[in-house]
Structures are given as C-alpha cells and as structure tokens.
C-alpha cells in the first residue's frame, strides 16, 4: 500500500511538532515578567494547530522542496501565523523557517 503525504493546504489545520510546542510553552510572554499560562496556550493551540510527529513534517517539507527558505522550525502557517515567530521563525511559503544565517 502506497502512503502519500498530503500537501499542507489539505490539512484541516496548520501543524506543529511537539518539540516546537514545548519551546513555545517555555517562552516568556512579550512585555511580561511572568510565564504564559500553559493550559490557556494549549487550549488555543489545540483549536488552531494539529500536533504531528517530526518525521511526518520533515517528509512533507522534503516534498515541497523549499529548502532555500532556511531551517524549518516545525510548524506550518497555511491559515494561522507562526506561533514560533516569537522565537525567530517567520512564515515563508506556508512553513515557519528560521534564517540559517542568523545566530
């Protein structure tokens, strides 16, 4: 049986990997000295993003052939902006990428 990965646009929601989700949850809220409420963030993310495994996302990224955009951050941005933009991963070609030249 052949297994074909759907294009990002065919997902019902944008996707995010568990490692990126953890990084977002550990990020401090902008202009605040307190940590963001993890439960509230998880509820929002569950409504707008689908958590998928790293290998599934990596395979889909290889098929889209947008490697020149930078290093994939583990999140798509077809409908919802990148949650990882707070950690330097803006949206390019429906995927959140980090500039490989930035430190």
Curated annotation (Swiss-Prot):
SUPFAM superfamilies: Cyclotides
Signal peptide range in chain numbering: 1-9
Presence of the UniProt keyword Disulfide bond in the record: yes
Gene Ontology terms: biological process: defense response
Stored InterPro entries: Cyclotide (IPR005535), Cyclotide_bracelet_CS (IPR012323), Cyclotide_sf (IPR036146)
The keyword NAD appears for this protein: no
Propeptide residue intervals: 10-69, 100-103
PTM annotation: This is a cyclic peptide.
Keyword terms: Disulfide bond, Knottin, Plant defense, Signal
Disulfide cysteine pairs (residue numbers): 73-89, 77-91, 82-96
Cross-link (Cyclopeptide (Gly-Asn)): 70-99
Family in the record: Belongs to the cyclotide family. Bracelet subfamily.
Function of the protein: Probably participates in a plant defense mechanism.
Domain notes: The presence of a 'disulfide through disulfide knot' structurally defines this protein as a knottin.
Annotated protein name in UniProt: Cyclotide vibi-K
Species assigned in the record: Viola biflora (Yellow wood violet)
């Amino acid at each position: 049986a052949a297994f074909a990965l759907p294009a990002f646009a065919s997902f019902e929601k944008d996707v995010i990997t568990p490692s990126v989700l953890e990084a977002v949850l550990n990020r401090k809220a902008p202009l605040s000295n307190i940590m963001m409420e993890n439960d509230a963030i998880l509820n929002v993310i569950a409504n707008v993003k689908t958590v998928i495994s790293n290998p599934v996302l990596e395979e889909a990224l290889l098929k889209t052939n947008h490697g020149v955009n930078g290093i994939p951050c583990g999140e798509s941005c077809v409908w919802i902006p990148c949650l990882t933009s707070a950690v330097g991963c803006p949206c390019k070609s429906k995927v959140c990428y980090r500039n490989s030249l930035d430190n």
